[in-house]
């Protein structure tokens, strides 16, 4: 092991030897040949690893002392070259894509998912305290570490359990992969879990101008994180590019739903059928198409933004500006066997539901939320999903705070009017309605 001294150079320190044994001879002062130098470095690394396993407390103290000398500032400096120092934050989607391609590479021969220019390793099963400093220390003997990044949750700043180590050369990355895979991690009771990342961390993220191939995933358990959701889908569908669990900005907790972005339309279609009702953690997922136009980016900042809902058709009627506080949703195309309790379940994921009404024999229903934002989220995410046996179509319903008149004069719930016009369970609305719904999904950027 090499440790810095007061003069800025490094001294070689070997682990304690047992009594009666002859200590190893001191290192020669002359500079050894490169091949011998590499062999000596490798032997020192092995001795260091053995010492850490035999004397974990002393090894940790030495490691902490070394870290304090190298990085006195409480915030860890990134281990990288100038280019990385200018851009210390990596894009979320790019790393999520690397994460899914790691799962894909597990089913392929080593190196099959990358090319000869890939110099980045994926490191998984990280404990919560394992940060960039820890990973850099583990691989620093190669003297070729270019950058280190541990992926963290943007809301909690806690580690997601994986990260990336980029090397200066492909050969150095290969050596680290072969040497450390399965080796017990320093100061831990678990082995290194390594694999090739899909591409170098310095490459640009893919263009977001392609088709939107996202799905909505509801009924998520509270403990499901981005990484868990990603792993659930990426293990079966190699084209998965990212996953995002929507977090309540006020509580910091999951809202119980999220999005998964695909790169292949056929796989997305398969997932909507095969994964609907499948378990993720302790709950069965409810899967449907993600209707926001840019759901692949998991929404923009909080607030209302125009989007087009799938299946929108022109019709009669309009919504005046006075309806900006309307929180009632019309649900068309309902299965005749769906009860009000069945209808309430998927909508309750998005906020407090005030009332649910299903007029007899009309093939439709109404869901009223306590606030407009919850209704907007529900429309944006549930339109075109399956409830019961049918695919439903959502639009804004009649606000119960206005007295709507109809030819028949009949109303439901003091404000649900037949004047809305039922066409086999579908309400005739003007096309502008389908552009008024807004996604209120916290941004991933």
UniProtKB/Swiss-Prot annotation:
Spell out the subunit comment: Interacts with the poly(A) tail of mRNA in nucleus.
UniProt lists compositionally biased (Polar residues) regions at: 1-12
| InterPro entries for this protein | Nucleotide-bd_a/b_plait_sf, RBD_domain_sf, RBM42_RBP45_47-like, RRM_dom
Q: Which Gene3D superfamilies match?
A: 3.30.70.330
- Top-level lineage group: Eukaryota
- Family statement: Belongs to the polyadenylate-binding RBP47 family.
Induction line: Repressed by ozone-induced oxidative stress.
What's the name of the protein?
Answer: Polyadenylate-binding protein RBP47A
Region Disordered: list its residue ranges. 1-45, 93-117
Specify residue ranges for compositional bias: Low complexity. Answer: 36-45, 93-108
């Amino acid at each position: 092991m090499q440790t810095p001294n007061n003069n800025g150079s490094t001294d070689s320190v070997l682990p304690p030897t047992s009594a009666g044994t002859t200590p190893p001879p001191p290192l020669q002062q002359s500079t050894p040949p490169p091949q011998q130098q590499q062999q000596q470095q490798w032997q020192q690394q092995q001795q260091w690893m053995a010492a850490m396993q035999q004397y974990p407390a002393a090894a940790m103290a030495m490691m902490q002392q070394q870290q304090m000398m190298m990085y006195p500032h409480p915030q860890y400096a990134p281990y990288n070259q100038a280019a990385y120092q200018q851009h210390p934050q990596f894009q979320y989607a790019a790393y999520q894509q690397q994460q899914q391609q790691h799962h894909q590479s597990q089913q392929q021969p080593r190196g099959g998912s990358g090319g000869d220019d890939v110099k980045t390793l994926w490191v998984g099963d990280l404990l919560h305290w394992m940060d960039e400093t820890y990973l850099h220390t583990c691989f620093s003997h190669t003297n070729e570490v270019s950058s280190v990044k541990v992926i963290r949750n943007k809301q909690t700043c806690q580690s997601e359990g994986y990260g990336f180590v980029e090397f200066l050369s492909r050969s150095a990355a290969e050596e680290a992969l072969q040497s450390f895979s399965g080796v017990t991690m320093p100061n831990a009771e678990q082995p290194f879990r390594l694999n090739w990342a899909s591409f170098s961390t310095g490459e640009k993220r893919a263009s977001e101008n392609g088709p939107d191939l996202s799905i909505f995933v509801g009924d998520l358990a509270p403990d499901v994180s981005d990484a868990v959701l990603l792993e659930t889908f990426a293990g079966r569908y190699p084209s998965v590019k990212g996953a995002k669990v929507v977090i309540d900005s006020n509580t910091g907790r999951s809202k119980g739903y999220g999005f998964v972005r695909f790169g292949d339309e056929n796989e997305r279609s398969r997932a909507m059928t095969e994964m609907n009702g499948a378990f993720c953690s302790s709950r069965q997922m409810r899967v449907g198409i993600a209707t926001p136009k840019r759901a692949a980016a998991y929404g923009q900042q909080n607030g209302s933004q125009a989007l087009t809902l799938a299946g929108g058709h022109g019709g009669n009627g309009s919504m005046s500006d006075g309806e900006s506080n309307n929180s009632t949703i019309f649900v068309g195309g309902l299965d005749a066997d769906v009860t009000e309790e069945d209808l309430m379940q998927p909508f309750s994921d998005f906020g407090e539901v005030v009332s649910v009404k299903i007029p007899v024999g009309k093939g439709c229903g109404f869901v009223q939320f306590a606030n407009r934002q919850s209704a907007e989220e529900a429309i944006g995410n549930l339109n075109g999903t399956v409830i019961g046996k049918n695919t439903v179509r959502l639009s804004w319903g009649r606000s119960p705070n206005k007295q709507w008149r109809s030819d028949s004069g009949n109303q439901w719930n003091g404000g649900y009017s037949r004047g809305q016009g039922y066409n086999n369970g579908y309400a005739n609305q003007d096309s502008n309605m389908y552009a008024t719904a807004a996604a209120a999904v916290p941004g991933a950027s």
